[in-house]
Regions:
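A generic "binding-loop/recognition-motif" signal
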Residues: 24, 34, 53, 69-70, ...
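Short, conserved beta-strand element in jelly-roll/cupin
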Residues: 32-48
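Short acidic-glycine-tyrosine-enriched beta hairpin
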Residues: 51-67
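Ligand-binding loop in jelly-roll beta-barrel domains
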Residues: 67-91
């Protein structure tokens, strides 16, 4: 799925779409959100740790984080740019 398709899919599923980025080396310790999130990396990389399992996402990769899911974020050495979707938790 490319960036245009990803954005269209987010909108179809009721996500608010925005573009963002984080600085190189930034670490965000364990936390959770009150919303469902989907993210596609469009520059750099980010590692998410969930349930003690780390997974690194590179350009073109995408992931979903459900509302209430505890996770940590570690940004790669060149930062990360992304397109993201956010929507109120379903249910």
């Amino acid at each position: 799925m490319n960036q245009i398709e990803f954005e269209a899919d987010l909108r179809r599923q009721g996500y608010q779409v925005f573009y963002g980025g984080l600085q190189a080396g930034m670490v965000n310790p364990d936390h959770a959100h009150d919303w469902d999130a989907r993210v596609m990396v469009i520059g750099g990389e980010i590692t998410l740790t969930r349930a003690a399992k780390a997974e690194t996402f590179h350009v073109g990769d995408n992931c979903a984080v459900a509302a209430g899911e505890v996770h940590a974020e570690r940004v790669g050495p060149q930062g990360v740019a992304y397109i993201a979707g956010r929507r109120n938790a379903v249910g």
